[in-house]
């Protein structure tokens, strides 16, 4: 492909701010857009059909708790969280960490309000074998 398909979820996050309907197709991986559910939880009007993700304009992004579905989808949710009002909490950031070394620190260095903290105990976070669950909080300072 002319564009690395690994970049598709990150471009999809940018499409959330477009003024017109946008779509992107991944011709390699059928389940590339696992981030679409998180986009919708944030308030976007996003839907997938096969390998195509379509985003309609007009969705107002508001912070909430979302789960990083995979490496690139998690990074896309971080970008969407930066565009959202309020605080976005991304659970399972280990997906992001395994592919983007120092991602949180780089974004913070660019001025993003992003930090690591213990995962919220609201029942929406799946239990893992880790002793302490970690999440990324984006959008407010403490």
What are the roles of these predicted feature ranges?
Residues 1-142:
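Short, structured segments at the rim of ligand-binding sites
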């Amino acid at each position: 492909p002319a564009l690395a398909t690994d970049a598709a979820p990150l471009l999809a996050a940018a499409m959330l701010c477009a003024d017109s309907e946008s779509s992107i197709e991944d011709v390699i991986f059928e389940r590339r857009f696992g981030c679409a559910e998180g986009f919708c939880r944030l308030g976007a009007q996003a839907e997938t059909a096969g390998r195509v993700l379509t985003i309609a304009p007009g969705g107002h992004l508001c912070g909430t708790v979302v789960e990083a579905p995979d490496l690139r989808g998690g990074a896309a949710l971080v970008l969407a969280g930066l565009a959202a009002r309020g605080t976005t909490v991304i659970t399972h950031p280990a997906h992001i960490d395994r592919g983007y070394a120092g991602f949180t620190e780089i974004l913070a260095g660019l001025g993003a309000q992003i930090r690591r903290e213990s995962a919220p105990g609201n029942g929406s976070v799946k239990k893992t074998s880790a002793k302490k669950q970690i999440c990324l909080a984006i959008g407010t300072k403490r």
